[in-house]
Regions:
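Basic, Lys/Arg-enriched alpha-helical interface segments
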Residues: 1-90, 96-118
């Protein structure tokens, strides 16, 4: 999703940082809601994903999803799917393309996704 007039300008990755891309319109809207509700925590999420989207240092906050949610398809390619806990309820889900060093945000919301409630 390319930025449009009036959109925030994302900083480009520098050095070893990963590129962050929004994969869905819903994720773009949810990211905006997270920024409005918890800007500091959302910023920390952004920095963590740029630095190391595969980090296992804080598994309560950032972890790979399991079972049927462990992978998802984007553009015909299957990618590992991870989740980052931004707030008590807010989550970001992302796919990792290691070859392109790109993180694709596929879900962002101030609410916990319902598909993990069962």
């Amino acid at each position: 999703v390319s930025p449009k007039r009036g959109d925030d300008v994302p900083p480009p990755p520098v050095g070893d940082e990963w590129r962050l891309r929004v994969a869905t319109n819903e994720a773009a809207k949810g990211w905006g809601n997270l920024c409005a509700e918890a800007s500091g925590k959302t910023r920390r999420c952004c920095e963590a994903l740029r630095r190391d989207p595969l980090s296992m240092s804080d598994p309560d906050r950032q972890h790979r999803l399991r079972g049927r949610l462990a992978t998802a398809v984007l553009g015909g390619t299957e990618h590992p799917q991870w989740e980052y806990e931004v707030t008590a309820g807010g989550r970001v889900r992302y796919l990792i393309d290691q070859a392109k060093r790109t993180v694709y945000l596929v879900y962002a919301s101030t609410r916990h996704p319902k598909d993990t409630d069962t």
